[in-house]
Amino acid sequence: MTILASISSIGNVKSISKSNNFSSLSNSSLQSSNSIQCGGCGGGSPLIGTVGNLVGGVLVGTGIIVGTVVGTVNGVVGGLLSGPNCGCH
């Protein structure tokens, strides 16, 4: 009984580890797409986009959606501050 319980707990740890790796990979891909799509062309807007991506990188797991929203909002604000040709592309 003890051997079976320890084996099943090892299997649970492996599956949790795999799901964490997947969420961090998808977070990185969303984060990189935010930096490509949302950016400014002058002033402080690149800094604003960088702050949004840093927030997206800190929030892992459920923060994937939150980081995407923050990056998009910051890109739009940076575009409004910089001019009509800047923002999310």
From Swiss-Prot:
Belongs to the hssA/B family. One of its GO terms (biological process) is sorocarp development. This is HssA/B-like protein 15. InterPro entries: HssA/B-related. It comes from Dictyostelium discoideum (Social amoeba). It comes from the Eukaryota.
